[in-house]
Swiss-Prot record:
The gene coding this protein: PME13
Tissue: Expressed in flower buds.
Disulfide bridge map: C443-C463
Taxonomic lineage of the native organism: Eukaryota, Viridiplantae, Streptophyta, Embryophyta, Tracheophyta
Catalytic activity: [(1->4)-alpha-D-galacturonosyl methyl ester](n) + n H2O = [(1->4)-alpha-D-galacturonosyl](n) + n methanol + n H(+)
Region ranges (Disordered): 55-102
Signal peptide annotation: none
Descriptive protein name: Probable pectinesterase/pectinesterase inhibitor 13
Keywords linked to the UniProt accession: Aspartyl esterase, Disulfide bond, Glycoprotein, Hydrolase, Membrane, Transmembrane, Transmembrane helix
Misc note: The PMEI region may act as an autoinhibitory domain and prevent untimely PME activity during transport.
Amino acid sequence: MAFQDFDKIQERVNANRKRKFRKRIIVGTVSLLVVVAAIVGGAFAYVAYEKRNEQQQQQQQAKNHNKSGSGNNVVKDSDKKSPSPPTPSQKAPVSAAQSVKPGQGDKIIQTLCSSTLYMQICEKTLKNRTDKGFALDNPTTFLKSAIEAVNEDLDLVLEKVLSLKTENQDDKDAIEQCKLLVEDAKEETVASLNKINVTEVNSFEKVVPDLESWLSAVMSYQETCLDGFEEGNLKSEVKTSVNSSQVLTSNSLALIKTFTENLSPVMKVVERHLLDDIPSWVSNDDRRMLRAVDVKALKPNATVAKDGSGDFTTINDALRAMPEKYEGRYIIYVKQGIYDEYVTVDKKKANLTMVGDGSQKTIVTGNKSHAKKIRTFLTATFVAQGEGFMAQSMGFRNTAGPEGHQAVAIRVQSDRSIFLNCRFEGYQDTLYAYTHRQYYRSCVIVGTIDFIFGDAAAIFQNCNIFIRKGLPGQKNTVTAQGRVDKFQTTGFVVHNCKIAANEDLKPVKEEYKSYLGRPWKNYSRTIIMESKIENVIDPVGWLRWQETDFAIDTLYYAEYNNKGSSGDTTSRVKWPGFKVINKEEALNYTVGPFLQGDWISASGSPVKLGLYDA
């Protein structure tokens, strides 16, 4: 072994020590807050006492370390340093009602903010609120304060966007789109605040998946707002405002992660992906619906048929007739036929199920495209926004062809959405898995460039993914995941799927290089595991974004236990962000932990919560 290898090992050892030290300090800080909260009673007093002993040991270690002449600063990035982690008060709590000592609030803020990417802004945000009388009584009040700052900043973004003046129609469209997206973002932050307001500290971990999903969506909405503007003065004006709210959102997500990691050992909360209770949003009707084979057994609320044999002849007419308030799941049965219409299931239409006669029998089709000067975001044939949307045995198409360039068949931003035995056909940008938690089972997805893209937390399980023939000279990419921040809980997981050439590509596949994906945004995250990858995929596996080094250090691309002629990872890219993972790491991206998949299994949909080789 070379001498420089010993140096690298020592650097890693030192870095691990620093990380462990900081984690212990944060654990102690959060434990102290929990005790002060007066919610958890005497059990937490004992835990805090144990933490106090651990903190005293760490404090003594820190003193000894400083005497030796080296500091205990933690380096987060090459150009960004955090101050030495402060040590919370060592005095054990005498009672649960005890208040925090003067000056201790600042130390706690510093400690909690040390886990964020934008530490100084985090400290300033929380400090400003404590100065205004913000109560330092439990961990969730810190988080609430951080999210309130996001919500207030979004008001400023909206104010800025509405003040913009232009005569250019493209810019006007971008302004209108951004306005709607900022309003969507505000809805998510308000929902997050409402959730925190009704949650006790000892139940906090149960609501974390919702908070992470909603705030991750806020990040996506902010980014899409910016993407809508062409480069120029107008975009620069908006970018300054939007970037500010993105920073605050990132800090909120980081604080959630900090509290989750450090409340778990304190409170022994049940693992969120192994809940014993069936979630309240899943009804018995949902389970019967997804288990049903005969559509007549569904007892739909409305039937759509082009031949007039149903209640409506168009899907949109059926949606307009759906009651504004409906208890339980509302089912629309769409009979065989090609429905040439643009459909939006808006946010008010929650818990809606659409069932067709088959993915190649009941088809919703359109042909909007970027080539027709339509924004990619608005080209979707079908849009699913309402929470809890389910589709079974349906087909979704965009027939713009390869000449249409970006042309979306479906855009999904419905939280806890399920697609079972569905088919998605297009070329570039076929399936826009935009935001929130999504599950696709036994589906067929067909396209050319970035044909599964977006910033959702989405798992594709037991699906057939077919790469088709595009324009001459084009390179095909299956995925283009758009995670913009390391604390977002989003990403794509392709699990036990088949990736192969479509029939039209097979004879000429040597003329079209195809790849598993490319990084659309800085923290793009895609995992391909336990899948069959046929020889349509280039041995390097992954493609750079427009032949640059963009995101190759910050992305997370992983493969685990794949098979097929292109499943061999020997010749894969040598990027810092790509890795071949082991079983332990792969488990993190199964349905259970990644989507908190109890809601899927409770719905009656077939699902594999863990690995197939377990």
